[in-house]
Every structure is written in structure tokens, then in C-alpha cells.
């Protein structure tokens, strides 16, 4: 099992997270999340194009919103509040994504940015939950693709 705390060794800035606007937390959380996903799919070794396809599939707003739905039951009230602040601060997203989905993804990113800055151990726990969930999704999708279709 990957220890994401060791893989994300950067020291957070000394700016208290509560002084950052939710959009800034989301901006930062987006980078933290993409690094997590890239690390998650780094093994087994594969071609760069395959890495890219996997990462893009999981950093899309639709995936982030789905993962936030999964995490909701594990979130504390403070974490839910940070999510709501990020969701409510979301600007208009790309036209290809429904506004509700984009706002949920922004809230998800704000939560990850907040946790990175305030509680790296909790972020590690969230990433472990997500890693298990994502691997399960990928495995189920792989098995479904390998199963012969019934006609």
C-alpha cells in the first residue's frame, strides 16, 4: 500500500488555511489531487499515453464529484463545511460539464487543499480510502470488459 504522506513531502506554506479563499484552496487541491492520481497509476509501468488516459479519466470533474459522494459518509462536519464553501465559491465551469457537477468537483478540490494545509495525516486517510475505491472501480471495469457479452 502506498504511503501518500511520504510521496507528498512538500511542506505547506505558513499561511493559515482559514485565511485562503475557497477558490484558492480548490486551485491548490486540484494540484494535490492530480499528483495523488498520477502516483496511484504509476505502477505497473506502461506507455505514457496509457498513463495519461488513466489520469485524465480520474481527474475529470465527473469523477471528482463521484468520489466526493463516496467520501461524504467519512467526512467530519468541518470537512463537509469546507466542501460546501468550495462548492458555493465555484465559478462557471466548462460547458461540457453540468454546473452542479463542476461545483461538487470544486468543493472536493477545496477539501483536499484544506486538508493538505491543515491536516496531512487526515489527507493520507482520505487518499487511502480513495485509492481503495478507485482500484475497486478499475478492477470492476476491467472484469466487465473481459466478460463475454451475452447475446
From Swiss-Prot:
Coiled coil: none annotated. Its main location: cytoplasm. SUPFAM superfamilies: RNase III domain-like. InterPro entries: Mini3_fam, RNase_III_dom, RNase_III_sf. The active site is at 30. Homodimer. This is Mini-ribonuclease 3. The lineage of its organism: Bacteria, Bacillati, Cyanobacteriota, Cyanophyceae, Acaryochloridales.
Amino acid at each position: 500500500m502506498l504511503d501518500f504522506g511520504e510521496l507528498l513531502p512538500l511542506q505547506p506554506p505558513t499561511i493559515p488555511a482559514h485565511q485562503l479563499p475557497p477558490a484558492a484552496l480548490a486551485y491548490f487541491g486540484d494540484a494535490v489531487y492530480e499528483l495523488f492520481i498520477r502516483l496511484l497509476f504509476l505502477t505497473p509501468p506502461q506507455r505514457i499515453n496509457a498513463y495519461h488516459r488513466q489520469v485524465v479519466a480520474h481527474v475529470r470533474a465527473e469523477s471528482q464529484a463521484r468520489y466526493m459522494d463516496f467520501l461524504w459518509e467519512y467526512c467530519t462536519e468541518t470537512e463537509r463545511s469546507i466542501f460546501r464553501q468550495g462548492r458555493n465559491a465555484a465559478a462557471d465551469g466548462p460547458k461540457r460539464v453540468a454546473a452542479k457537477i463542476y461545483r461538487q468537483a470544486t468543493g472536493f478540490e477545496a477539501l483536499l487543499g484544506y486538508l493538505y494545509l491543515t491536516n496531512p495525516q487526515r489527507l493520507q486517510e482520505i487518499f487511502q480510502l480513495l485509492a481503495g475505491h478507485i482500484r475497486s472501480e478499475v478492477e470492476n471495469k476491467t472484469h466487465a470488459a473481459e466478460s463475454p457479452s451475452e447475446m
